[in-house]
Structure formats: C-alpha cells, structure tokens
C-alpha cells in the first residue's frame, strides 16, 4: 500500500545503507533486501570501483539516493556543479525520490562537511524552501528533507524545530525523511518532548524513516550510527507509524560497522512495527 499520498511515494519496506565493508558479501551472496540507500556524494565520480559496484547493485536491487551536502539551509545559492553531478547520478540510479538534510554547512563557497542546524525563523524557512524547489525542478525527482540531530540552538528562533520543519515542507511542497533517532537525540540534548515532535509533524508528507543508534556521553547524546537502535527510539518509530501508515524505513549504521548479517537483523526488527500498523491501516 502507499506510504502516503504525497508525491506518489510508495512503501519500499525496509532498507539498509550500502556500505563498503558489505560490498563483497552483497555481490556474492545476493541477500534478500527490499532496497539499499546510497550516500549520493560517494558515487558522484567519473569511474572507479564505487560506480562499478553500484551498477552491479542496480541490476539486483532498488536504490534510493541520500545526500549530505545540498545545504538547503545555507544562505548562499545552490552549487550548480554539485547539482549537475547529482543529476547524472539520479539518471543512473533512477531513484524514486531523493533525500538530503534540512541544515546548513557552507559559507562563501567554503564547506564545513557537517550538518549544522539552522535558526528556526520564517526567513530561514523561506530560503530553504526556495532552494528545495530549485533543486527539485533541476533534478526532476521528488525531494524529501531530513531533520538533523543538533547540539546547539539559536536565540533568534521563532518557533520549535517541528514547526520549522512543517513550515519548510509546506512552502517547498516536498516530503519529509523523518529521522526518529535524530528526534530522540535532539530531545535529550535540548529538553523537549519527542512525542510532541512526532505528533505535530505533517504525517501526509513523511516519505521515509531513518532509524539508527547513538552514543550517550555524560552531558549529551551524539548521533553516531554505531550501535543498535534502543527501545525508546523504536517506541517513537511505532508512534510515528501510527500516524503515517506503513512507510519506507532505512537503518543507518555508519561506524564500527558489524557484519552484514548483524546489520540486516537489526533492520528487520522494524518489520514487526510495520506489520502491526498495516493490520490497522
């Protein structure tokens, strides 16, 4: 069944991030996986092993692109060279939708290579929405933006993070990649109620979920993607699914990566929540 009515996104089931340590296992064993998510920037090249592996993956699996450097929240214009390379990859993968983060990370052509939070103001929402529309029109593929984990806030913010996310996606007429772990991490770092966040996101625009693990330090939590998903995050995920219906879900595991079997097993834990929601849909 459709994940929701927005932009014709469909439920792809449960996906896994395509990572280098698993290349050989996937190509040789051809495990049963609903889809793979790739980091777009890792494949925006003219040749080499990454593209060769990607082409082999595309012969067997569905692939969705996830970006880390569009920087829709930066004040400067979109990087046209980046968009051109991204479009070549879009045509190669035939990705049904494309995701990137609602953040900033560039100033005057210099890049932090980080996903930094934006001030939650109406002016910032207008800038981000305009850039999302421009990217979508150029790439000719639906776009969904992801909420980032954050460790600092701006005094000038005029609304909550979930209100800002809603404002941006309504203005841009785009989808949401709802990262449930990021909501949990930010809620613990900033002291807001993650349930309130889940309950106020426009459910009809949620095109995809991210779930992941994190690391707890003495005074804060860091979104490290190097542990299994904890129970409170699964509970938030289930609550979100009750609002969205069955929706494409992706497990991220990017550091201290275990065997493919262990990552796959962790991802498949989402199935019981998807099936429970499907029964009542």
PLM regions: where:
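Acidic (Asp/Glu)-rich catalytic clusters
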Residues: 25-31, 48-65, 81-96, 133-138, ...
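Active-site acidic/histidine proton-transfer and metal-coordination neighborhood
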Residues: 79-176
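C-terminal helical cap(s) of enzyme catalytic domains, especially alpha/beta-barrels
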Residues: 260-280
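Active-site beta-loop-alpha junctions enriched in small/polar residues
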Residues: 19-21, 39-41, 68-71, 102-103, ...
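N-terminal pre-domain/capping segments
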Residues: 1-88
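Gly/Pro-rich active-site loop or hairpin
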Residues: 47, 77, 115-121, 125, ...
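Conserved, mostly hydrophobic/aromatic
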Residues: 36, 98, 143, 179, ...
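Acidic-and-aromatic substrate-binding clefts and catalytic sites of carbohydrate-active enzymes
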Residues: 23, 40-52, 71-81, 151-159, ...
